[in-house]
C-alpha cells in the first residue's frame, strides 16, 4: 500500500494497473485499449491470462502480460492467441523472444541483468497501420555478457595466458563482461 508507485504524484498521461485483477485502460482519442493487471506478489502460480479476451469495441487492443514460467504466471501461447488481441506485450524474460511474429513477443531487457543474459539486448519498435502490426528488434545494449572459450595447452605460463585473454577480450570488445571457460 505504501509503495512508491502508489504514493508518487504521476503526470496525467501516465497510467498503470493498480490491482491484481483484470483491468482495461482506454485511450479514447486514439481508440486504444490496454489490458493488464498489477503484479503484487513475489510469485503467482495461477495462469491468470488464459481466459482473457479483448472486448468487442472497435480499436486497437493490447494485452500487457508479465510472466511465463511456473512461478510467475504461467503463459500458454495458444490461449493467448485465442484472446483476439492485436498486440501482446510480454514481460519477465530477459531475452528477446517472438512467440508469434510481430504481435506477441518478449522484448527482453534493454541491458543484460546477469551472467545468464547472453545474446543481444534492445527494444521493440512497432507500427500499427490499417489493422497490421509490424515490429522489429532494435539492439540497444552498451555491453553484453559473453562466454569466452580459451584452449590452454600444458606448459602455458600465466603471463601467456593473461596475454591470450587480453587479446581475445580486445578483439570482442573491452566493454563486454566475459565468463572465461
Language-model-detected regions and their locations in the chain:
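Binuclear metal-dependent phosphoesterase catalytic core
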Residues: 21-30, 107-179
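His/Asp/Glu-rich metal-coordinating catalytic cores
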Residues: 1-127
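Structural beta-sheet core signal
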Residues: 63, 179-180
